[in-house]
Amino acid sequence: MNIGEASKTSGVSSKMIRYYEQIGLISPALRTESSYRTYGDNDVHTLRFVRRARDLGFSVEQIKELLALWRDRSRASSDVKAVALEHIAELERKIAAIQEMTRTLKHLAGHCHGDDRPDCPIIEEIANGSAQVNMEVNPRFGVAALK
């Protein structure tokens, strides 16, 4: 099947399929004489695996590790569990950071009069960083993380 059919069948966009090939997450597709990519059932199965792992929030590096474990029939389930538990810990850190941001914003919004006056603690906090928020930005996750 061509890339469009593989995309439709797997639920992974053609653009992402090309990207996953480029970064080595999936094997390069076979090519026709006219250089079109062709995919088989195993390729689509792998793409579905990748899509599901992405849906669960695993990083590309974690997916590489999971794919290697999936392909290794002699793997120990404890290795797979370790990847999952590490991911759960990351998710819990993100949740805590988002909850802290929510508390801070609720506090600031509660002190903003929301009227015609220009004074606003939300703007003041963004401009000056004056609120005591115990967080730092983690560029890997795009959210603040607790210090």
Swiss-Prot record:
Q: Which CDD domains match?
A: HTH_CueR
Instruction: Say what the protein does.
Output: Transcriptional regulator involved in acid tolerance. Binds copper.
What residues does the HTH merR-type domain cover? 1-69
Mind telling me which InterPro entries this protein's record contains? CueR, DNA-bd_dom_put_sf, MerR-type_HTH_dom, MerR_fam, Tscrpt_reg_MerR_DNA-bd
Q: Does the keyword Glycosyltransferase apply?
A: no
- SUPFAM superfamilies, sorted: Putative DNA-binding domain (SSF46955)
The protein here is known as Heavy metal-dependent transcription regulator 2
In Gene Ontology terms, what is a biological process of this protein?
A: positive regulation of DNA-templated transcription
Q: Which UniProt keywords apply?
A: Copper, Cytoplasm, DNA-binding, Plasmid, Transcription, Transcription regulation
According to its record, what are the GO cellular component terms?
cytoplasm
MF terms in GO: copper ion binding; DNA binding; DNA-binding transcription factor activity
Q: What is its main location?
A: cytoplasm
Species of provenance: Rhizobium meliloti (strain 1021) (Ensifer meliloti)
Protein localization: Cytoplasm
DNA-binding region residues: the ranges are 3-22
